């Protein structure tokens, strides 16, 4: 039976080589597939790929621009901060100088007031001393005259004599105390 089937088909077909009709159909199908891919699919893929490349490159450029702008703003902020710090230091130094000037003015005024109070106190002390000395002279004179009257036994009622005697006596005491 095997022989019959083999003898019935006079063409022998090699299992390694395909039939030429299959090669033609395969080539036509491959050409049609290549045409469809080249005409429709590959351009669409190229557009999508180019859009992604543009988006990535644009994103990188935007990121670089944003980074450059951020660096520029950072430098501006640093410059402003440095300027603000120097202004604050200047203001602080000016305030210290003003405070020292005010302090010196207050001290000078306090010294003047202290000197004025001391001078007024000295004047008051001198005036009170003079008043006390005058009162004591009068009282000492009266006591001395009374004592002298009792010792001498006569009345020293004459006011002018009494005042002259008392003044001479007190002047003698002062000159003796001054030595």
Swiss-Prot record:
Alphabetically ordered keywords of this record: ATP synthesis, Cell membrane, CF(0), Hydrogen ion transport, Ion transport, Membrane, Transmembrane, Transmembrane helix, Transport
Subcellular location: Cell membrane
Pfam families per UniProt: ATP-synt_B
Keyword Membrane part of the UniProt annotation: yes
Disulfide partners: none
Primary localisation category: membrane
CDD domains from the UniProt entry: ATP-synt_Fo_b
GO CC annotations, alphabetized: plasma membrane; proton-transporting ATP synthase complex
Membrane protein topology class: Single-pass membrane protein
Domain of life: Bacteria
Transmembrane spans: 23-43
GO MF entries: proton-transporting ATP synthase activity, rotational mechanism; proton-transporting ATPase activity, rotational mechanism
Protein task: F(1)F(0) ATP synthase produces ATP from ADP in the presence of a proton or sodium gradient. F-type ATPases consist of two structural domains, F(1) containing the extramembraneous catalytic core and F(0) containing the membrane proton channel, linked together by a central stalk and a peripheral stalk. During catalysis, ATP synthesis in the catalytic domain of F(1) is coupled via a rotary mechanism of the central stalk subunits to proton translocation. Component of the F(0) channel, it forms part of the peripheral stalk, linking F(1) to F(0).
Protein family per UniProt: Belongs to the ATPase B chain family.
Record note on quaternary structure: F-type ATPases have 2 components, F(1) - the catalytic core - and F(0) - the membrane proton channel. F(1) has five subunits: alpha(3), beta(3), gamma(1), delta(1), epsilon(1). F(0) has three main subunits: a(1), b(2) and c(10-14). The alpha and beta chains form an alternating ring which encloses part of the gamma chain. F(1) is attached to F(0) by a central stalk formed by the gamma and epsilon chains, while a peripheral stalk is formed by the delta and b chains.
Protein name: ATP synthase subunit b
């Amino acid at each position: 039976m095997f022989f019959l089937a083999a003898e019935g088909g006079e063409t022998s077909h090699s299992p390694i080589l395909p039939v030429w009709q299959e090669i033609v159909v395969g080539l036509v199908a491959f050409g049609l597939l290549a045409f469809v891919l080249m005409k429709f699919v590959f351009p669409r893929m190229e557009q999508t790929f180019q859009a992604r490349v543009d988006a990535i490159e644009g994103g990188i450029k935007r990121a670089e621009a944003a980074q450059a702008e951020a660096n520029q703003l950072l430098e501006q902020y640093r410059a402003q901060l440095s300027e603000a710090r120097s202004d604050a230091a200047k203001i602080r130094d000016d305030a210290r100088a003003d405070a020292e000037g005010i302090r010196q003015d207050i001290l000078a005024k306090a010294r003047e007031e202290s000197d004025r109070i001391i001078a007024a106190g000295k004047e008051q002390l001198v005036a009170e001393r003079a008043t006390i000395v005058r009162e004591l002279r009068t009282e000492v004179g009266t006591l001395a005259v009374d004592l002298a009257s009792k010792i001498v036994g006569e009345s020293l009622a004459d006011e002018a004599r009494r005042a002259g005697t008392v003044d001479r006596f007190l002047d003698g005491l002062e000159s003796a105390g001054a030595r």
